Amino acid sequence: MLILDKPAGLPVHRGPRGGASLEDWLPALALGKHRLPQPAHRLDTDTAGCLVLGRTRPMLAELGALFAAGRAAKTYWAVVRGAPPRPSGTVDAPLLKRSTAKEGWWMAVDPAGQPARTTWRVLGKAAGLTWLELRPKTGRTHQIRVHCAHLGCPILGDARYGGGEGRLHLLARAIALPLDPPRGATAPPPPHMRDALAACGWA
């Protein structure tokens, strides 16, 4: 298996319009194996940080089972606009995919949606901004982004969910996998997040 620090803006899979993607790098990451490594989970194009790949079919299946069962411990950092109502808490809000011809698709909090749960805590603050640590307990699409918006503090740069223009300030900070032996990694903040994090107290 491999754990990569995926750059923000690089899609994991090549889209219908082509362009650069992580797939371009998979042959170099094969490291002598005939089978190309494959992602074991999703990571949004605009999110930087830890991405796990399986190099063999058995390992990919084992990793997939860990993620499906919620046993892979994922930690995210985000810089959000505004502040949550208290120092820590849990968002338990189901998510449903919606779409229109004009606006495309997005995820919304809806009682008819799939269960989604995220714990969070405040790590630091600045004028109009808050640095959050978030731990998703489920793996829904756009879960952290929608849950932050649901808290009333959308992620900085998240135009889709109310965080304004600019680059998305969301980092897949760490991953811990209960393998034998255990495996894990921590990713540094990408350059575009460092000023906002420093303003909130990161050093």
Q: Where are the regions a protein language model picked out?
A:
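RNA pseudouridine synthases
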Residues: 1-106, 111-117, 124-126, 169, ...
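Loop/turn elements at beta-strand to alpha-helix junctions within RNA-recognition modules
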Residues: 57, 137-138
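Short histidine-centered loop motifs in beta-beta connectors
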Residues: 127-135
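Beta-rich strand-turn-strand
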Residues: 138-141, 189
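Short beta-strand segments enriched for Tyr within beta-sheet-rich domains
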Residues: 140-148
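Phosphate/ribose-recognition catalytic cores of enzymes acting on nucleotide-derived substrates
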Residues: 148-188
